[in-house]
Regions:
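PLP-dependent class I/II
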Residues: 1-147
């Protein structure tokens, strides 16, 4: 079955000389990627070689950039990397994978950009940021700060 599907893809590519399908899919994936990242409040570094089929967000990188090293140390000391994706699923009904299962950083999360609508990726971006901000609020409360 896989060989047949590969043969059909190859045959289709021979007929689509202008790469219309390929360009359409690449545009769709980029729009989804942009929609997700724009709604995290994080900056997506341009990469002309990015395939974009999956996107990985390293939560620890953004924890440090947004709240500092002290917050990042708090996260590592008080939570397991899987807690983030579990918290995300419980609070927002968004299910993402932990990136370490794909040889990514322990505190990374991974989203497939292949199967949801663009608006769903906006929700994912907002949900990821919401959970990170909730952890930061817990950290501030633990330090005795109110906000």
């Amino acid at each position: 079955p896989q060989q047949m599907q590969m043969a059909l893809f190859a045959a289709y590519a021979l007929f689509d000389k202008e790469d219309r399908y390929k360009k359409k899919i690449q545009k769709m994936i980029k729009e989804r990627l942009d929609a997700m990242w724009e709604n995290t409040g994080f900056e997506l570094v341009p990469d002309p070689l990015r395939a974009g089929y999956y996107s990985e967000i390293d939560i620890m990188v953004w924890a440090k950039k947004l709240y500092g090293d002290e917050f990042a140390c708090y996260l590592e000391a008080n939570y397991d990397p899987l807690d983030f994706v579990i918290h995300l699923a419980k609070d927002t009904c968004i299910v993402l994978l932990n990136g370490s299962g794909f040889d990514g950083p322990d505190w990374s999360i991974r989203a497939s950009l292949a199967n949801l609508d663009k608006d769903d990726y906006k929700k994912i971006g907002k949900g990821v940021r919401l959970i990170l901000d909730e952890y930061a609020l817990a950290w501030k409360k633990a330090k005795g700060e109110s906000k």
